[in-house]
Amino acid sequence: MGFTEGDGSFIVSTRGNLMFVITQSTVDIQVLHYIEQELGFGRVIKQGHKTSRFIVQDISNLYILIQLFNGNIVFPSKQNSFFQFVSHFNKLSNFPTVATINTLTLPTYYDNWFCGFTDARHRRGCFTCSLLGNSTVYRFRFLLAPVS
């Protein structure tokens, strides 16, 4: 979930088509192939020399993703785009109407959300260990830049 909140998008195109996309540097394309393999659907494409994407467009697999994400989103901005996505999905599909769960999840130290989000936002989050001055005292920190 955290990885998607960092680098994923729920897209409604100007034509009304639905698409779920996770974007990564082509250097990390193996992550996208791993997601494709674990889910058993979607496709990975290269977009230019530096960017690759994992894409899901078919309605039946979008329905599965909606079930996974519904009620499991942390950020209000991602939840808003998800709700718009689900609203369009309900209009387009023959699946039972999906009622969105209007609560935000709070990540804990005991789940993998922080790891996924930090990995996705590799330039905005990191773990550090440093020695303080000339002593043997060290400090561990988790740094995360603000999310817009």
What are these regions (language model features)?
Residues 1-148:
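Internal intein/HINT superfamily modules and their associated LAGLIDADG
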